[in-house]
Amino acid sequence: AVKTDAFRHPDTVAASVSEDASRLLWDAELLLRKVYDIHGSDSESVDIIEYYDFDALKRQRRENYRYMLEHCPKSDAYTIVFPYLDDATVPSHFTLYAADRGKFKEYLSQNGIHATSYWPVGPYINLEGHTDCAYIYDHVISIPCDQRYTAEDMAYICRVLKDF
């Protein structure tokens, strides 16, 4: 017999697909619940989720970013990617375009500053004719400014940037 929905009434096909999708959804949901039950969660993680002061998190991130914007020295070695902080943004990183990212990242590392280079060019990505994209891939670097850091940390980063 030919297994095709071409000769079945559309309502029957839709019902069948809907039933299959529903069954898959609930199978996946039950599997996730089993995984959660097996691994559970520790009380500290539950407390963090239930009681964490997210307003303080947002405030600290914004203060750190604002500090970097106000105190980061101008340099030919890098350009600030997002030079304005609007009211809705809660950044986790201070992102720059570095003229020589490798040298810049190594310098930061030598001074105890972790910086991240995101988005490596994948093997199937062709940047030919996309010079703006290629520039971003080759130059973007991010320095964390999240709630773990203080104004003193941001001041240290700015001093290190000044000496680059």
Which stretches of residues belong to each language-model region?
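PLP-dependent aminotransferase class I/II
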Residues: 2-164
